[in-house]
Amino acid sequence: MHFKYIVAVSFLIASAYARSVQNDEQSLSQRDVLEEESLREIRGIGGKILSGLKTALKGAAKELASTYLHRKRTAEEHEVMKRLEAIMRDLDSLDYPEEASERETRGFNQDKIANLFTKKEKRILGPVLGLVGSALGGLIKKIG
């Protein structure tokens, strides 16, 4: 008789344990889904910020390029234009990485000047900030 009670109690304990494990798995999966959704939202916001920043940098680079384009250039300004072109290619490669890699393999010799900096971040941000600073300095000098 005691054997039946032992089997019944062990069966109840096993089923309660199975239910608790199942509930834990459900709560973990719900938590994972919520974390994944919040990560997607964060990535979406980050993507929008980066997209806006890329657009602003492209606009600034195009404006500087058009400023230097319509007048005679010195060797230093010519080097600046080459860097601007490299920056524009890098910004485009962020949007279309497959096409950019194809372009780079086709025109490798033309891109030697663009490869002055080793990392893309340095190639994009360093020259842009320098060019924007020098352009603003030149404008302030002309105004003042």
From Swiss-Prot:
Compartments in which it is found: Secreted
Domain of life (superkingdom): Eukaryota
GO biological process: one example: defense response to bacterium
Transmembrane segments: none
Primary localization class, coarse: secreted
Signal peptide range: 1-18
Residues annotated with Isoleucine amide modification: 143
Keywords noted in UniProt: Amidation, Amphibian defense peptide, Antibiotic, Antimicrobial, Cleavage on pair of basic residues, Cytolysis, Fungicide, Hemolysis, Secreted, Signal
Signal is among the record's keywords: yes
UniProt note on tissues of expression: Expressed by the skin glands.
GO cellular component terms given for this protein: extracellular region
Pro-peptide region(s): 19-43, 73-122
Keyword Glycoprotein: no
UniProt xrefs under InterPro entries: Bombinin
Role according to the record: Maximin-3 shows antibacterial activity against both Gram-positive and Gram-negative bacteria. It also shows antimicrobial activity against the fungus C.albicans, but not against A.flavus nor P.uticale. It has little hemolytic activity. It possess a significant cytotoxicity against tumor cell lines. It possess a significant anti-HIV activity. It shows high spermicidal activity.
Protein family (similarity comment): Belongs to the bombinin family.
Name of this chain's protein: Maximins 3/H11 type 2
Species the sequence originates in: Bombina maxima
Species lineage: Eukaryota, Metazoa, Chordata, Craniata, Vertebrata
